[in-house]
């Protein structure tokens, strides 16, 4: 049986980590693509040389030509400029939109059957543009946002409660940015909703509010500490979880940036929502009831994403 083929567009810190994780999890053969000559080849060779030690069999190919991604089953896009201290995700819009146009053309030509995961920021606008540039069906193009945001929220809560991260489940909706909406009443520890844990004295509402804000600022916190780049371990792990659910038809319920067609009152935009990811890509979008305050927060988040999409159209009118 032929191995799956995973194409990584962008061979920076996230791309290299993605390649290593794909090898460790034995998801398939990996093509690292980058416009910088030598970078994908060097990282691919380095990871391949670790395979005898880590005990996995996979082929790693570095390339500077999109032809190398031909026939890929999964394409994960990290290409673009990363955040620097003081930058918001939105500051990257103009530069990375041009990158998405080139990437979209490459995918359209060489990997039109692939399941595409976009990581490039500002995420919700970039995945929206990438789907349009590539022409791929919307259920086969998603953005990595909610899995990462949820992971951060889960980790911060596990620290607060001094429990295993495995016993914490959370719910994060909306855009991947300052306006994301972590939903406390749909988030639990061992099945106990967070508001009940506040009543039980496990934490205070003030502490919970601070954790929610820290989740919103999670990416910026790491950018501020690293100073020369942005997060890469957790984003890569999050995208690999999505790819694995698709390749193995696991049908995981994962929060991703998916194109909505009326759910939550939104049409033709990519927004973070819970989905079922299986062999057909986005197989279901789960729509939950929101109270008045949650709906207001969600609508604010959607409006922020809509503004970014309008800005994209201003730069590239063909997206309209």
UniProtKB/Swiss-Prot annotation:
Biological-process GO terms, alphabetical: lactate metabolic process; tricarboxylic acid cycle
Keywords attached to this entry: NAD, Oxidoreductase, Tricarboxylic acid cycle
Residues of the signal peptide: none
GO MF terms held by the record: L-lactate dehydrogenase activity; L-malate dehydrogenase (NAD+) activity
Top-level division of the source organism's lineage: Bacteria
Xref: InterPro entries: L-lactate/malate_DH, Lactate/malate_DH_C, Lactate/malate_DH_N, Lactate_DH/Glyco_Ohase_4_C, Malate_DH_type3, NAD(P)-bd_dom_sf
Enzyme class: oxidoreductase
Keyword Coiled coil in annotation: no
EC number(s) recorded for this UniProt protein: 1.1.1.37
Residues binding substrate, per UniProt: 83, 89, 121, 152
Keyword Oxidoreductase: yes
Residues forming the catalytic site: 176
Homology family: Belongs to the LDH/MDH superfamily. MDH type 3 family.
Biological role stated in the UniProt entry: Catalyzes the reversible oxidation of malate to oxaloacetate.
Name of the protein in its database record: Malate dehydrogenase
Organism name: Brucella abortus (strain 2308)
Gene name of the record: mdh
């Amino acid at each position: 049986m032929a191995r799956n083929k995973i194409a990584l567009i962008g061979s920076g810190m996230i791309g290299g980590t993605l390649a290593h994780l794909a090898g460790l999890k034995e998801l398939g053969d990996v093509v690292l693509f980058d416009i910088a000559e030598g970078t994908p080849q060097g990282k691919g060779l380095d990871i391949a040389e670790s395979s005898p030690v880590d005990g996995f069999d996979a082929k790693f190919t570095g390339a500077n030509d999109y032809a190398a991604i031909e026939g890929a089953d999964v394409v994960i896009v990290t290409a673009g400029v990363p955040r620097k201290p003081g930058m918001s995700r939105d500051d990257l819009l103009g530069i990375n939109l041009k990158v998405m146009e080139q990437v979209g053309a490459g995918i359209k030509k060489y990997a039109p059957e692939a399941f595409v995961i976009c990581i490039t920021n500002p995420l919700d606008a970039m995945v929206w543009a990438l789907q349009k540039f590539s022409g791929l069906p919307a259920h086969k193009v998603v953005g990595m946002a909610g899995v990462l945001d949820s992971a951060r929220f889960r980790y911060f809560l596990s620290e607060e409660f001094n429990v295993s991260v495995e016993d914490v489940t959370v719910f994060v909706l909306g855009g991947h940015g300052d306006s994301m909406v972590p939903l406390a009443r749909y988030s639990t520890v061992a099945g106990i909703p967070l508001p009940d844990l506040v009543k039980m004295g496990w934490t205070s509402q003030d502490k919970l509010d601070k954790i929610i804000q820290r989740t919103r600022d999670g990416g910026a916190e790491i950018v501020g500490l690293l100073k020369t780049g942005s997060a890469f371990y957790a984003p890569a792990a999050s995208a690999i979880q999505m790819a694995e659910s698709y390749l193995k038809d696991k049908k995981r319920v994962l929060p991703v940036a998916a194109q909505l067609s009326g759910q939550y009152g939104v049409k033709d935009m990519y927004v973070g929502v819970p989905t079922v990811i299986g062999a057909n890509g986005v197989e279901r979008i789960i729509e939950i009831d929101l109270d008045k305050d949650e709906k207001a927060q969600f609508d604010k988040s959607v409006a922020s994403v809509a503004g970014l999409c309008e800005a994209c159209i201003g730069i590239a009118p063909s997206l309209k």
